[in-house]
Amino acid sequence: MTTRPFIVIDLDNTFVDYTTAFKECLEQIGYDGYADAPDPSDYSFACEGWFDNVRTQPVLHRRAVGLGLYLRERPYPHAPEALDDLRHGGFRIVLATSRYDDQEDTDRWLCGMGFEGGRLDDLAECNTDFATIVRDRWTARLGWCHMSDKTALGADLTIEDNPHTLDRLMDKKMRVLVKRHAYNLPQCERAEQSGLGLSFDDWTQVPALAKRLVEENAK
């Protein structure tokens, strides 16, 4: 483990509320009836209360991005405070997202919300492997980057909601802290039963759970 433990935090539906912002965009587009839609039970949004097939959400997502979807997202309650606790608790933090369609919106959002984070994407121009640079050479306490394969970052702990990403992380015996949703309940159970992680509903739980998992990882 690194001298200062390294934590990767996902953005959409982990640190920030994607689903609510997506609903707002759907209403603007003219798709009424989703304001009270439940937490989706499938990551594809092809489930009760949402869409009939897996092809619908990607199309509407692209339209929503054009309407400023990522700029509309808000942190979950207590998430910024938990982030501050982790940063000041000696952890290196990188916000890692797979949203490659955001242009400059993520950068603008972080600036607008007052998160003074370094954009790490420019380091990809170096000859050294990008993931290695982020993992081993980033010494500031907060950074952010685009990263489709979060297992490559080799974090001491990854805070995540995507069931597919969670499975890949756990397949590699990497520690996870799962933001619980209806669509990732099997991963919550897997994390806890395997001893590779825990799950949470409220960000007030995160600092203590993260410290516990990192300490267990160090043993």
Each model region followed by its residue ranges:
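Short hydrophobic/aromatic-enriched beta-strand-loop microsegments
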Residues: Y34, G117-D122, K173-H181
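Short, acidic loop-to-helix structural element flanking the phosphoryl-transfer center
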Residues: L67-L95, D101-D107
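Active-site neighborhood of HAD-like aspartate-dependent phosphohydrolases
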Residues: T2-T56
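Anion (oxyanion) recognition and catalysis
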Residues: E27, D84-R87, M170
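Charged phosphate-binding loop/patch that engages nucleotide di/tri-phosphates or the phosphate backbone
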Residues: S194-K219
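Substrate-recognition "cap/lid" segment bordering the active-site pocket of phosphatases
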Residues: A96-M170
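Acidic, Mg2+-coordinating phosphoryl-transfer loop and its flanking beta/alpha structural elements
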Residues: L157-D201
